[in-house]
Amino acid sequence: MTYEWAREKALKVARSILEGDVGIIEGARLLSSFGHELVPDWTLDPDFVVLGALDSETDHLPVGAERKLWEEKALAERDAIVSRIEAEAKEEVESACRNILRRFAGA
């Protein structure tokens, strides 16, 4: 993965989250995977810390394409948890997305 590739993907995902096309958890997972390429130390970067923390806290929950692998009853139980966590994290993740767009759009 190159810096430029990661930058372009991060910008696309950040926009998709803000436009509501990608869920908060799914988007945070994607964005957190680019942090190591975009910043010197993602664990010290306030935007990527938010994204990485949410990724870590929710790595047991099915989002995106992974949902197709889950049994319907188990999925329904997890959906309530996903909805609650996404509602709680929405403002902070969207702020990180706006910061990422501002920081990397002109880079």
Segments predicted by a language model, with ranges:
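Acidic, Ser/Pro/Thr-rich low-complexity regulatory regions
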Residues: 1-107
